[in-house]
């Protein structure tokens, strides 16, 4: 089974994806890590690489290619990515979107990155604006359209362990009814 975990910065997607991969003994791949590795090789931070990526689609294509290689080669995979839910949905089994209000995400990032809350807010707003513009320009994706996701979870009041339990419960329910209902079946009920 291939599962995508998407969401904005600070939503908990990396923590949840790692824990879920461990629980299921699945391989874990992070688009964020691939992107950070590219930034490091180029001597840039994330914000500046995002700025470069606004005009250089090759950066995103490198990340996408790497993820797609994993999709083709792995049977059991957790993909953590901002946009994989939109890009690779047809090649995966389940797509999950995690989110939380801006203030909560900023607080998480401030603690994680040891920066001020104001710096975290500024960083998130810049990144999200750049993502929105870039993903719309290069992919035609509206990151506010969550209709491609099977499950959307507000992570603000739930810890990582319980989010993973919720996802595992969902996966169990889905595996009991793997075939989607046909329109005729819905109308007959």
Curated annotation (Swiss-Prot):
It is found in: Cytoplasm. It catalyses: CMP + ATP = CDP + ADP; dCMP + ATP = dCDP + ADP. One of its GO terms (biological process) is pyrimidine nucleotide metabolic process. Keywords: ATP-binding, Cytoplasm, Kinase, Nucleotide-binding, Transferase. GO terms for molecular function: ATP binding; CMP kinase activity; dCMP kinase activity. It holds the Pfam family Cytidylate_kin2. ATP binds at residues 7-15. It is an enzyme of class 2 (transferase). Its EC number is 2.7.4.25. InterPro entries: Cyt_kin_arch, Cytidylate_kinase_dom, P-loop_NTPase. One of its GO terms (cellular component) is cytoplasm. Belongs to the cytidylate kinase family. Type 2 subfamily. This is Cytidylate kinase.
């Amino acid at each position: 089974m291939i599962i995508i975990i998407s969401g904005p910065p600070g939503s908990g997607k990396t923590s949840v994806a790692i824990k879920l991969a461990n629980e299921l003994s699945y391989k874990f791949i992070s688009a964020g890590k691939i992107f950070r590795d590219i930034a490091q090789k180029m001597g840039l931070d994330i914000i500046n690489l995002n700025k470069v990526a606004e005009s250089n689609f090759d950066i995103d294509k490198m990340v996408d290619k790497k993820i797609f290689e994993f999709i083709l080669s792995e049977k059991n995979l957790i993909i953590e990515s901002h946009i994989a839910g939109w890009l690779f949905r047809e090649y995966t089994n389940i797509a999950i979107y995690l989110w939380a209000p801006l203030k909560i995400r900023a607080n998480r990032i401030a603690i994680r990155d040891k920066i001020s809350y104001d710096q975290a807010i500024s960083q998130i707003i810049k990144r999200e604006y750049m993502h929105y513009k870039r993903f719309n320009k290069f992919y035609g994706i509206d990151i506010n359209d969550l209709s491609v996701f099977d499950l959307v979870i507000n992570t603000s009041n739930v810890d990582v362990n319980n989010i993973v339990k919720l996802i595992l419960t969902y996966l169990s329910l889905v595996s009991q009814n793997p075939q989607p209902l046909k329109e005729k079946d819905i109308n007959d009920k």
